[in-house]
């Protein structure tokens, strides 16, 4: 059974567009559910607009893939060719399947989430930088996001990839606000199956020390910087 289902609409027919492609995908899900048992994501296109999303995504959550190989200078050219060459090159496709599609919860329902192109390429670079830092000065760098661009999920994807790259390291997430600590912890907790471990919030500096004592691998722990002043 297919891992990806693609629905194409003719650009020469004015009566059909990418919204019709999305509607057709939803029809397939209702009429041929077995086609989507192993589905990773879907693609809809009328050649003018091409987007990818998961079976739980609304039309507004299908996203363009704006670069073939991570070169942001080409990111303004989001088209059919860029998405297919960017997402379906064999090694990148395997990476997407293995570390950039996760399940979470929204309004009490399970949703499947596909990484956006900027998350995919930024996480790869961040992990490479972290590996170099581990061998040199310990400075991995800054992973910068604009508001609303999915930083919480980027951190989840980063943690997943880092687990494989560094043989299951222990990860401590430090923030400077209680609300942000709770937000990030909540996102990681919703993705615990994807991460194959349950994150833990440290209640105090002593608790964090206890969680880390004697640990040689695994574990994702959350704390705030203020706890170090207690």
For each predicted feature, which ranges?
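Acidic/polar loop patches that form or flank catalytic/metal-binding clefts of enzymes
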Residues: 195-201
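Conserved motor-coupling elements within RecA-like helicase/translocase cores
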Residues: 203-221
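Conserved residues at beta->alpha junctions
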Residues: 175
């Amino acid at each position: 059974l297919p891992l990806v289902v693609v629905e194409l609409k003719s650009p020469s027919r004015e009566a059909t567009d990418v919204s019709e492609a999305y509607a057709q995908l939803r029809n397939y899900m209702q009429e041929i559910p077995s086609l989507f048992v192993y589905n990773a994501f879907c693609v809809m296109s009328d050649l003018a607009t091409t987007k990818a999303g998961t079976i739980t995504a609304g039309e507004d959550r299908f996203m363009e893939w704006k670069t073939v190989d991570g070169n942001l200078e080409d990111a303004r050219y989001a088209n059919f060719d860029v998405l297919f060459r960017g997402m379906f090159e064999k090694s990148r496709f395997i990476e997407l399947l293995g570390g950039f599609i996760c399940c979470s919860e929204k309004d009490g329902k399970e949703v499947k989430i596909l990484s956006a192109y900027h998350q995919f390429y930024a996480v790869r670079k961040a992990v490479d930088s972290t590996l170099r830092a581990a061998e040199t000065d310990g400075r991995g760098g800054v992973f910068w996001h604009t508001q609303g661009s999915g930083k919480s999920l980027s951190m989840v994807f980063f943690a997943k990839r880092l687990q494989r790259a560094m043989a299951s390291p222990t990860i401590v997430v430090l923030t400077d606000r209680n609300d942000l600590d709770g937000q990030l912890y909540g996102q990681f907790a919703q993705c615990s199956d994807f991460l194959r471990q349950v994150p833990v919030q440290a209640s105090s500096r002593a608790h964090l020390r206890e969680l880390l004592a004697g640990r040689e691998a695994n574990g994702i722990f959350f704390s705030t910087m203020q706890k170090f002043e207690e």
